């Protein structure tokens, strides 16, 4: 994607964004509601044109080779359009025929996606009788039917129960490296648990990109260590403040133990442990406190608001 923009009248829904997704990569497309995620996906799946910029999917230009792009993409929209009067197998046969699958190849494809999406128990049931979770599975099976190299999934776990969410996450992870996956969502834990890399979009602009650990690292101001040490807060806090690189120490007493939050230029876990051992202090907790993806997301979105 290069310098992609989309206007609706004077409203700028997508603002000059650029990014690349590699073969076999699972990338989360993350942003609050109204950020421009779905508009971008509609452009990449040839549902609507961009105002300016360029994009290729599986080597095909989305503006001049739309049929080739559609053939290379399995797309699952947020609200899966299904025919409620059809049975699941009947619907998949219909969709397979639209994809150019016939005869033995189509039935083999249906069997493959039925098993992969856990639809065996409902394959002959009318879609109107299916729960939200099973309808989502049918939509995912449809996207996988023609075994496309690229999968674009828009909010694939919305409406699913916790067990179904875990199963869907597992399935998406299994799809790599045979498929390139773009997963659009506004649900932070969903993206963090599933994706290798995250692209954050806000008000149409790409505001951050990186792996979950890289994004968390960006918000960390130095290294924060949490420790619980047996003893008086004043004595322990004073000793820790003398350690090299320490910029802040918060100490409080809990049931005879001192709980410390230590911010320093580097990871001081080993130094704190050595200090406690030398002074004869018992330690029952010592770990680095990493910033959460939620912290980063809130900071980046809030920062974008402040810049406006």
Which residues does each predicted region cover?
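Positions that flank functional sites
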Residues: 111, 129, 255-256, 291
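C-terminal coupling/interaction segments
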Residues: 263-308
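Conserved catalytic Walker-motif region of ABC-type ATPase nucleotide-binding domains
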Residues: 1-4
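Hydrophobic/anchoring residues in structured secondary elements
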Residues: 6, 31, 248-251, 288
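ABC transporter nucleotide-binding domains
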Residues: 6-203, 207-208
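ABC transporter nucleotide-binding domain
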Residues: 169-263
């Amino acid at each position: 994607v290069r310098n992609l923009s989309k206007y609706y009248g004077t409203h700028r829904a997508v603002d000059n964004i650029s990014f690349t997704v590699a073969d076999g990569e699972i990338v989360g497309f993350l942003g609050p509601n109204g950020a421009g995620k779905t508009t971008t996906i509609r452009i990449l799946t040839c549902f609507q044109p961009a105002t300016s910029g360029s994009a290729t999917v599986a080597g095909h230009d989305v503006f001049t080779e739309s049929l080739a792009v559609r053939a290379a993409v399995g797309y699952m929209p947020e609200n899966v359009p299904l025919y409620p009067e059809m049975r699941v197998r009947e619907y998949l046969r219909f969709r397979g025929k639209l994809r150019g699958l016939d005869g033995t190849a189509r039935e083999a494809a249906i069997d493959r996606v039925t098993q992969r999406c856990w639809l065996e128990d409902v394959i002959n049931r009318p879609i109107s009788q299916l729960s939200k979770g099973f309808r989502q599975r049918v939509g995912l099976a449809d996207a996988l039917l023609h075994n496309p190299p690229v999968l674009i999934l828009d909010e694939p776990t919305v409406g699913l129960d916790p067990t179904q969410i875990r199963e869907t996450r597992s399935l998406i992870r299994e799809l790599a490296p045979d498929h390139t996956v773009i997963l659009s969502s506004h649900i932070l834990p969903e993206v963090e648990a599933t994706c290798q890399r995250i692209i954050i979009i806000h008000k149409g602009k790409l505001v951050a990109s990186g792996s979950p650990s890289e994004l968390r690292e960006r918000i960390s101001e130095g290294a924060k260590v949490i420790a619980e040490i047996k003893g008086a807060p004043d004595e322990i806090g004073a000793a820790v403040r003398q350690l090299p690189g320490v910029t802040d120490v918060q100490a409080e007493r809990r049931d005879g133990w001192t709980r410390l939050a230590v911010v320093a230029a580097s990871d001081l876990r080993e130094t704190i442990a050595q200090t406690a051992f030398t002074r004869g202090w018992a330690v029952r907790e010592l770990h680095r406190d990493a910033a959460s993806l939620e912290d980063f997301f809130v900071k980046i979105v809030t920062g974008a608001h402040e810049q406006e």
